[in-house]
């Protein structure tokens, strides 16, 4: 599948990659890892609670945004982690270079009654998604790949692979942490057609032109997370995420806007 990116977007990616490469090799970040002051803990039990505000596109490809206020909860016990967004994860290998894990998440699907632009389209039911994750870790960055699929075969019925490139570095006397990342998602044609395709029935009921997709890259995204530690217990977290649908996905008649920005702001208390 040929992915077409506009020239401006490519320039932005190159610029961000150059900036992040400078930070990857900074002595400050190296000192952070050496002193183990990154916001992570080796305790057997970690519990974080708080409150978050979220603003995001109504659905992928929507030109409208929705905002929500929701509680924040994150639990880690030994090699097991759980939070409502990422689901349940178990790491069965975690050493200096590699992390391998298995998890169970939830996909909310898509309700055609939630937006007038989806009228006449079939409903994509919510479903559970098993996830197999592999992470390669170095001193300055990590690369993570995670494959997910529809466990119940009652939702999108497909599978997708997300690969992320992450790093992190401190600012302001190691109290503020900057965590940038890049990622792309590759999905099979079953997943893509359920969310972005238009079949014969939908063509008649919705008025959208028939549209069929093959397996390929669904989106490219960049995010920037900032964590500010007020003290040993309380932190303020913010996350800015830019996502762009690409290739045949971006050309789907169901896509009103191919790119979008999501923001998350949280106040977290660490037990």
Task: Give the residues covered by each predicted segment.
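Repeated loop/turn-to-beta-strand initiation elements of outer-membrane beta-barrel proteins
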Residues: 47, 79-82, 98, 140-144, ...
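Extracellular loop and loop/strand-boundary signature of outer-membrane beta-barrel proteins
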Residues: 57-59, 116-120, 148-153, 207-212, ...
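Outer-membrane beta-barrel "beta-signal"
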Residues: 70-74, 165, 258-271
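Cleavable N-terminal export/targeting peptides
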Residues: 1-43
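Short glycine/proline- and aromatic-enriched beta-strand/turn motifs that initiate or cap beta-hairpins
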Residues: 30-83, 88
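Short sequence motifs at beta-strands and strand-loop junctions characteristic
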Residues: 41, 63-65, 82, 122-126, ...
């Amino acid at each position: 599948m040929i992915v077409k990116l506009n020239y401006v977007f490519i320039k932005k990616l190159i610029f961000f990659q150059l900036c992040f490469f400078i930070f990857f090799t900074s002595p400050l970040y190296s000192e952070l890892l050496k002193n183990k002051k990154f916001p992570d803990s080796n305790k057997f039990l970690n519990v974080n609670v708080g409150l978050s505000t979220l603003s995001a596109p109504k659905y992928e490809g929507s030109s409208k945004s929705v905002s929500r206020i929701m509680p924040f909860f994150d639990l880690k016990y030994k090699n097991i982690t759980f939070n409502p967004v990422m689901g349940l994860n178990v790491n069965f290998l975690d050493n200096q270079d590699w992390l391998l894990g298995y998890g169970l998440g939830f996909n909310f699907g898509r309700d055609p009654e939630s937006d007038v632009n989806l009228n006449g389209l079939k409903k994509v039911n919510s479903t559970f998604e098993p996830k197999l994750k592999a992470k390669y870790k170095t001193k300055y960055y990590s690369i993570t790949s995670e494959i997910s699929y529809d466990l119940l075969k009652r939702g999108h019925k497909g599978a997708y692979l997300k690969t992320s490139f992450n790093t992190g570095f401190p600012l302001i006397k190691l109290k503020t942490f900057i965590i940038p990342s890049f990622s792309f998602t590759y999905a099979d044609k079953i997943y893509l057609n359920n969310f972005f395709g238009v079949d014969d029935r939908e063509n008649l009921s919705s008025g959208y032109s028939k549209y069929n997709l093959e397996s390929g890259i669904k989106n490219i995204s960049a995010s920037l997370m900032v964590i500010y530690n007020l003290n040993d217990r309380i932190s303020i977290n913010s996350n800015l995420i830019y996502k762009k649908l690409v290739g045949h996905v971006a050309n789907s008649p169901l896509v009103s806007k191919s790119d979008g920005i999501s923001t998350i702001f949280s106040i977290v208390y660490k037990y």
